[in-house]
Amino acid sequence: MVDYSVWDHIEVSDDEDETHPNIDTASLFRWRHQARVERMEQFQKEKEELDRGCRECKRKVAECQRKLKELEVAEGEGGKAELERLQAEAQQLRKEERSWEQKLEEMRKKEKSMPWNVDTLSKDGFSKSMVNTKPEQAEEESEEVREQKHKTFVEKYEKQIKHFGMLRRWDDSQKYLSDNVHLVCEETANYLVIWCIDLEVEEKCALMEQVAHQTIVMQFILELAKSLKVDPRACFRQFFTKIKTADRQYMEGFNDELEAFKDRVRGRAKLRIEKAMKEYEEEERKKRLGPGGLDPVEVYESLPEELQKCFDAKDVQMLQDAISKMDPTDAKYHMQRCIDSGLWVPNSKSSEAKDGEEAGTGDPLLEATSKSGDEKDVSV
């Protein structure tokens, strides 16, 4: 049966207690609380003194009992008086011990009968709070460290990675990874991705699709390890068990990811080819640049049609006639561009003898040599 008598008298101030109009209610509550705290502190101090006195008395009783046992073992004639003294002392100490225990019991009863107040109604259930924090992640490796790690791994295991990339059956892949668990890592997946792009650039599409399948296998294993928060080497068998017994929806997800990956590979390969073509065209353009840094092809295409015909015909006289009919400013502008691009080299008679045989060899552009001794250079 529950004893509810402890609730009969509770010393708790109520905000609705009526006080004299001339008395500040807040101050009255504060004074009451202060007096109550002082009484509690005094009571606690007396209780601690009783505890210390009782413990000290018990220690003396135990010490006296030990001496009595030692004296009884000795059983000497001269120790009889000492034995009687210790027995009397032990009797007195036991009497004091009972007195201390009686005082402690009275103190406990007094404490139990004390009315509850705002400070004793409840006690702390916890002295501190524990908050789970996310474990500190290892510092991310720098780009240089990752590249060096990848390079070292590939140099050591490239042959094994390529062998895995050529497998197709689930059982074969699982067995090969079981025999070479070091391949179950991010470096293998990265190498397979790059290999797929290289194969697509080389137009080896069928082989690319084969390697792409194994790339997605490795990526699925890594994703499974990340979701389970375990090392990939500890869960790759779980992936193969899951994929071999997977339902239709799971297999469709795998195949969808595979097709999306192949599309991304084709896109990356296309961009790489376009970039290579642009770089090649830029190199060729730089090789064509004339002494003034202009591209002869671009300059030729920007010339008026009548000047283009002159260069197509490689006729100097025709070129001179066309220039004489043009506005002097336009003629100077176009001929200067021809000189800067190398389409036209003025004052080239000195090299006529050496280069005469090479002139007119099929080049659609006018070179810096004359064909005959009576041809004149154009100076603009």
UniProtKB/Swiss-Prot annotation:
Post-translational modification: Constitutively sumoylated by UBE2I.
Residue numbers of N-acetylvaline PTMs: 2
Any one Gene Ontology cellular component term annotated for this protein: cytoplasm
Region (Disordered): 124-145, 344-380
MF-aspect GO terms: ATP binding; heat shock protein binding; protein kinase binding; protein-folding chaperone binding; unfolded protein binding
Subunit-level organization: Probably forms a complex composed of chaperones HSP90 and HSP70, co-chaperones STIP1/HOP, CDC37, PPP5C, PTGES3/p23, TSC1 and client protein TSC2. Probably forms a complex composed of chaperones HSP90 and HSP70, co-chaperones CDC37, PPP5C, TSC1 and client protein TSC2, CDK4, AKT, RAF1 and NR3C1; this complex does not contain co-chaperones STIP1/HOP and PTGES3/p23. Forms a complex with Hsp90/HSP90AB1 and CDK6. Interacts with HSP90AA1. Interacts with AR, CDK4, CDK6 and EIF2AK1. Interacts with RB1. Interacts with KSR1. Interacts with FLCN, FNIP1 and FNIP2.
List of residues that carry N-acetylmethionine: 1
Signal peptide from the UniProt entry: none
Keywords associated with the record: Acetylation, ATP-binding, Cytoplasm, Nucleotide-binding, Phosphoprotein, Ubl conjugation
Record-linked InterPro entries: Cdc37, Cdc37_C, Cdc37_Hsp90-bd, Cdc37_Hsp90-bd_sf, Cdc37_N_dom
Organism: Bos taurus (Bovine)
Annotated positions of the N6-acetyllysine modification: 80, 156
Phosphoserine PTM positions: 13, 122, 379
GO terms, biological process: protein folding; protein stabilization
Places the protein is found: Cytoplasm
Protein name as annotated: Hsp90 co-chaperone Cdc37
Domain of life where this protein originates: Eukaryota
Biological role stated in the UniProt entry: Co-chaperone that binds to numerous kinases and promotes their interaction with the Hsp90 complex, resulting in stabilization and promotion of their activity. Inhibits HSP90AA1 ATPase activity.
Protein family according to the UniProt entry: Belongs to the CDC37 family.
